[in-house]
């Protein structure tokens, strides 16, 4: 009779040897592109708010200061004309919004996932886990189920659906995928973040400028990554290693950012001191993450930071004395896509590895070995992921 394995032996056999690794990245946006310079006129016209001349001027200044050149939105003029309640500040419109996002969120996620799977180059039957994240609508079965069907993944794929997490969740999905990949030998985790602003779009109101800030910043996009440990480098090409991941709630930050799903859609509120709260606590997060590595020079690591808005990036840069180049990839994504909530950091990761190759850097992290990825969002919650780059291959 063969000897039975001990629990310890089973446990060891179940776990990977090395760290979780990003093996492919894909991104997608809706076809409809809106340019920030034209947006105030369009926004006040479509919401029938041109009579609010002073508010329109304030909104123009917000858009001018946003450092955003263009955004992509599923909501076209035709869709908004057909759904006038979505153009009001507070009118019952949840059904119309839900009808859009429960279809379009998985569809946009599929487009990003297909690109990631194509780059990965392996059969989709090798995908063992799916983590799907969105703050755009809620449904049962969820967007994870819809995407599984759309992509033809195995019925036994192990799914995790994350709804209503907000802008920090691009870090959350990486943290979860890291644990899944490292604790399940041979696992290949498809991670998808898909965000569509149809849940948050609304007309202006004089007494709620924080809502107007969101209208100036948010855009639509989806990003997908494939994560696994112990890559087979004869058929898989590592991009970044996920070395550590943590989450924390910032002190004295309750109510700084929140969102509420109501009959009128998802309402969004933020306090003016959000950039200050984040910048005040950023160094502590960096120290906690990098002390085990003996790193305390924040210009010696590459940066992927959720671009909640230009003020956050400016204040973080000032607080830790960052060179302007460190946030180059982050600011590029803000400029070209706006704030796409959870998808942003994955877009930035994609931009960084592509630009590192184009600029002749030796690693996927702009020539540096170590890097940090930050997600900021409701709570205030901060996700901190320590990354290690890999050598750039031709």
Curated annotation (Swiss-Prot):
Gene: CHS2
Function: The primary product of this enzyme is 4,2',4',6'-tetrahydroxychalcone (also termed naringenin-chalcone or chalcone) which can under specific conditions spontaneously isomerize into naringenin.
Chain segments annotated as coiled-coil in the UniProt record: none
Reactions this protein catalyses: (E)-4-coumaroyl-CoA + 3 malonyl-CoA + 3 H(+) = 2',4,4',6'-tetrahydroxychalcone + 3 CO2 + 4 CoA
Active site positions: 167
Family (UniProt): Belongs to the thiolase-like superfamily. Chalcone/stilbene synthases family.
Disulfide cysteine pairs (residue numbers): none
Pfam families: Chal_sti_synt_C (PF02797), Chal_sti_synt_N (PF00195)
Principal EC category: transferase
Protein name: Chalcone synthase 2
One Gene Ontology biological process: polyketide biosynthetic process
Entry-linked Gene3D superfamilies: 3.40.47.10
């Amino acid at each position: 009779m063969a000897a039975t394995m001990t629990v310890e032996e089973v446990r060891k056999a179940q776990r990977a040897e090395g760290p979780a690794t990003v093996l492919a990245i894909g991104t997608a946006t809706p076809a409809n592109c809106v340019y920030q310079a034209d947006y105030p006129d369009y926004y006040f016209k479509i919401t029938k708010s041109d009579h609010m001349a002073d508010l329109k001027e304030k909104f123009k200044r917000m858009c001018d200061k946003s450092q955003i050149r263009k955004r992509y939105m599923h909501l076209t003029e035709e869709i908004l004309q057909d759904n006038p309640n979505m153009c009001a500040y507070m009118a019952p419109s949840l059904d119309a919004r839900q009808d859009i996002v429960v279809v379009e969120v998985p569809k946009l996620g599929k487009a990003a996932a297909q690109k990631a799977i194509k780059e990965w180059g392996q059969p989709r039957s090798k995908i063992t886990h799916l983590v799907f994240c969105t703050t755009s609508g809620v449904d049962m079965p969820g967007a994870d189920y819809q995407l599984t069907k759309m992509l033809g993944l195995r019925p036994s794929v192990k799914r995790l659906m994350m709804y209503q997490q907000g802008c920090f969740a691009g870090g959350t999905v990486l943290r979860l995928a890291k644990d899944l990949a490292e604790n399940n030998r041979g696992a290949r985790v498809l991670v998808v973040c898909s965000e569509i602003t149809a849940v948050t779009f609304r007309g202006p109101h004089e007494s709620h400028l924080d809502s107007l800030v969101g209208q100036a910043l948010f855009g639509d996009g989806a990003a997908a990554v494939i994560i696994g440990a112990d890559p087979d480098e004869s058929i898989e090409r590592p991009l970044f290693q996920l070395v550590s991941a943590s989450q924390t709630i910032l002190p004295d930050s309750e109510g700084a950012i929140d969102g509420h799903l109501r009959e009128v859609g998802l309402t969004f509120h933020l306090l003016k001191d959000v950039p200050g709260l984040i910048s005040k606590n950023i160094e502590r997060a960096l120290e906690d993450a990098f002390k085990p590595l003996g790193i305390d020079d924040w210009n010696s690591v590459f940066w992927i930071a959720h671009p909640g808005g230009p003020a956050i990036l400016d204040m973080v840069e000032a607080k830790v004395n960052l060179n302007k180049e460190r946030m180059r990839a982050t600011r590029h994504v803000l400029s070209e896509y706006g704030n796409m909530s959870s998808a942003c950091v994955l877009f930035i990761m994609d931009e960084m590895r592509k630009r590192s190759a184009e600029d002749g850097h030796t690693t996927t992290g702009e020539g540096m070995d170590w890097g940090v990825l930050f997600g900021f969002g409701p709570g205030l919650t901060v996700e901190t992921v320590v990354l290690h780059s890999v050598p750039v291959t031709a």
